[in-house]
């Protein structure tokens, strides 16, 4: 049972996920809206869904008849605040002197707001929606998302750069358009910047950001209401799913002898959101703790692995690239049986990205996370040249959700496996679930497999055969089996 009393003649009502119409009555000069539902069926939540999807029915009500009306309400709260403040003007001049270009000015202003203005929300009374004056925020050196957004927009406007506060929903995201227009649809404020024909969505509350405008990490909140912008309705932040992260992994397994341990070297380069995650981790955890976590992860696959030193890292803040280098020793890597030597190859780069949902027979799309790309190159350096028979043709597995490509190659004692994964969208649509699961089964075959070669010390004539192949390769100008 739900009962609403209001004196507003503009009250609007909407039900989502269920056909429902309230009873309307007059009660002591007020309008009454009454809802009653009986024998409501149980709802089972699939889980693992993106924020805008919900299996539950809900109702929405508002006194606003359009998003333009909400924008007008917000514009009145944000207008006329602090453009000519002496402190704001002085700060803008300082940033301008430090900047090599307008693009550099934008990121310097952003990093100032992020790192020099402490995040603190005192959302009481009118300050639950009205931002504080930029000069007040500069004086006190703290502010919430509204305060930071307006300060950043004000600093950018001082440089003649078009910028506006933008209301977004971190909870509903793309689902905000399903509800009625209302200020209550939003719970966060960021800054929209129009620069050189592109729209940038900057968040003054984020930390650990670095790089230029096109290197920054970001969150796709789906739709935004840009306060005071010429387009006063909801705007889709990114018309096409943007690539939120990229991770490039290079692994090298170095063997000195088939009877000796191998050295595993791993170099991982993180971009955009992924770089910010690593920057946070390495600034807030000890290297020993990170080393222990990494070692526990690899220990799930290599039982005789030990770390050689602690992970090393390089933070390229100019390009927002964070590189981590690790070194391990693996004992008992090679297995021998009769005249054969074999070893396991683990392609671990994608384990945390591609998973099967806990509920396969779903009623809602399966959420994978923001679109991203991962590349992996693995080199296995044998202790001597071997004969390794491979299918060296590239293999591509693709469906509406993802694209996975891999290839095997061997040359001069080095086995190389290259692979890449592109997540094209954040959700697996219901109609694509079967193809996603089938593709994942096929892809997982590339994550663990065995390489087998003849033991050069046991097989008669093996070394002579390798010498002959090498001479033929030279004579043929690069013959390669």
Regions found by a protein language model. Give the residues of each.
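A sensor for short, sequence-defined functional sites
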Residues: 1-481
């Amino acid at each position: 049972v739900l009962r609403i009393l209001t004196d507003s003649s503009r009250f609007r009502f909407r039900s989502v996920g269920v056909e429902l119409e309230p009873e309307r009555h007059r009660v002591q000069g007020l309008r009454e809206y009454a809802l009653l539902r009986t024998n409501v069926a149980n709802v089972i939540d699939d889980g693992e869904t993106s924020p805008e999807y919900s299996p539950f029915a809900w109702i929405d009500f508002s006194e606003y008849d359009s998003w333009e009306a909400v924008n007008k309400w917000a514009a009145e709260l944000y207008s006329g605040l602090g453009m000519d403040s002496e402190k704001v003007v002085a700060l803008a001049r300082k940033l301008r002197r430090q900047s090599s270009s307008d693009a550099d000015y934008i990121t310097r202003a952003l990093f100032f707001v992020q790192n020099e203005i402490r995040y603190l929300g005192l959302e009481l009374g009118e300050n639950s929606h009205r931002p504080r004056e930029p000069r007040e925020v500069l004086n006190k050196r703290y502010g919430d998302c509204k305060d930071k957004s307006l300060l950043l927009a004000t600093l950018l406007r001082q440089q003649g750069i078009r910028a506006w506060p933008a209301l977004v929903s971190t909870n509903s995201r793309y689902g905000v358009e399903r509800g009625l227009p209302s200020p209550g649809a939003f719970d966060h404020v960021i800054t929209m910047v129009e620069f050189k024909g592109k729209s940038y969505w900057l968040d003054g509350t984020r930390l650990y950001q670095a790089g230029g405008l096109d290197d920054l990490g970001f969150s796709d909140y789906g739709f935004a209401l840009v306060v005071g912008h010429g387009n006063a309705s909801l705007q889709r932040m990114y018309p096409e799913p943007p690539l939120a992260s990229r991770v490039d992994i290079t692994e090298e397994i170095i063997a000195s002898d088939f009877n000796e341990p191998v050295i595993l070297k791993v170099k991982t380069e993180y971009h955009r959101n992924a770089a910010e995650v690593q920057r946070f981790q390495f600034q807030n955890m000890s290297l020993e703790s990170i080393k222990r976590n990494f070692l526990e992860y690899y220990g799930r696959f290599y039982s005789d692995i030990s770390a050689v030193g602690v992970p090393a890292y390089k933070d390229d803040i100019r390009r927002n690239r964070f590189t981590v280098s690790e070194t391990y020793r693996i004992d008992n890597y090679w297995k021998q049986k009769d005249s054969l030597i074999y070893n396991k190859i683990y392609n671990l780069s994608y384990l945390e990205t591609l998973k099967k949902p806990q509920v396969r027979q779903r009623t809602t799309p399966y959420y994978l996370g923001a679109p991203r790309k991962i590349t992996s190159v693995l080199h296995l350096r044998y202790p001597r040249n071997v004969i390794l028979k491979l299918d060296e043709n590239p293999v591509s597995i693709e469906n509406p959700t993802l694209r996975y490509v891999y290839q095997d190659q061997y040359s001069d004692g080095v086995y190389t496996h290259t692979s890449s994964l592109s997540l094209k969208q954040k959700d697996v649509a219901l109609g694509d679930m079967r193809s996603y699961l089938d593709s994942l089964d096929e892809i997982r075959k590339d994550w663990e497999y065995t390489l087998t070669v003849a033991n050069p010390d046991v097989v008669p004539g093996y070394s002579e055969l390798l010498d002959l192949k090498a001479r033929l390769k030279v004579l043929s100008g690069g013959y390669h089996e």
